Curated annotation (Swiss-Prot):
Entry-linked NCBIfam families: PRK05412.1
Taxonomy of the source species: Bacteria, Pseudomonadati, Pseudomonadota, Gammaproteobacteria, Enterobacterales
GO cellular component, one term: cytosol
Protein name: Nucleotide-binding protein KPK_4305
The entry's keywords: Nucleotide-binding
Species assigned in the record: Klebsiella pneumoniae (strain 342)
Family statement: Belongs to the YajQ family.
Domain of life, per lineage: Bacteria
Length: 163
C-alpha cells in the first residue's frame, strides 16, 4: 500500500545561512550604521535571538530575517515570534523559535481534516510525524493538497513516499 509521512522540519544549515545573510545586510545598511543590531542562532534550542537598540529596529530586523529565510526556502510560519519585545538595559531583543516537529494539537487537527475529507486513507500519529496510507496514489496526492491548503499555522513536508 502506498504511504507517506507528514513532517515539519527546518533545515538548520539553511537557517544558519539565512541568519548570516541577514547579518551581512544589516552591516551594509545605512539605517543601521553605528547601531548595535545582531542575530544569534542557537542550534541547541533552535532559536534566533534578534537584538537592537530600539523596538522599532527589532521589528525591522525581524522583517529582514523573514525575507532571508524565505529566500533560503524556509517559510515565515516556521518562525514562532513572541508578541512582546524584551527591554534589558539599553537593548531590546526578541527570541524567535524555529518550529520543529508537529505539536499534538496540530496533529489531531490534521488527522481530523483528513478523516473529514472522506478520502479512502488512514492517518496515524507516530511521534512528531503523521503516517498516511491508502490504496491509491491519487488519494495520497489529494491528502497532500488538502494539508497544503489547510491553514494550520506551520509548513509541512512530505517524506518517505512509498508505492
Amino acid at each position: 500500500m502506498p504511504s507517506f509521512d507528514i513532517v515539519s522540519e527546518v533545515d538548520l544549515q539553511e537557517a544558519r545561512n539565512a541568519v548570516d545573510n541577514a547579518s551581512r545586510e544589516v552591516e551594509s545598511r545605512f539605517d543601521f550604521r553605528g547601531v548595535e543590531a545582531t542575530f544569534e542562532l542557537n542550534d541547541a534550542n533552535k532559536t534566533i535571538k534578534v537584538l537592537s537598540e530600539s523596538d522599532f529596529q527589532v521589528n525591522q530586523l525581524l522583517d529582514i530575517l523573514r525575507a532571508k529565510l524565505l529566500k533560503r526556502g524556509i517559510e515565515g510560519t516556521s518562525l514562532d515570534v513572541p508578541e512582546d519585545i524584551v527591554h534589558s538595559g539599553k537593548t531590546w531583543f526578541v527570541e524567535a523559535k524555529l518550529k520543529q516537529g508537529i505539536e499534538s494539537a496540530v496533529q489531531k487537527k490534521i488527522v481530523k481534516l483528513i478523516k473529514d475529507s472522506k478520502l479512502k486513507v488512514q492517518a496515524q500519529i507516530q511521534g512528531e510525524e503523521i503516517r498516511v496510507t491508502g490504496k491509491s496514489r491519487d488519494d495520497l496526492q489529494s491528502v497532500m493538497a488538502l494539508v497544503r491548503g489547510g491553514d494550520l499555522g506551520q509548513p509541512f513536508q512530505f517524506k518517505n513516499f512509498r508505492d
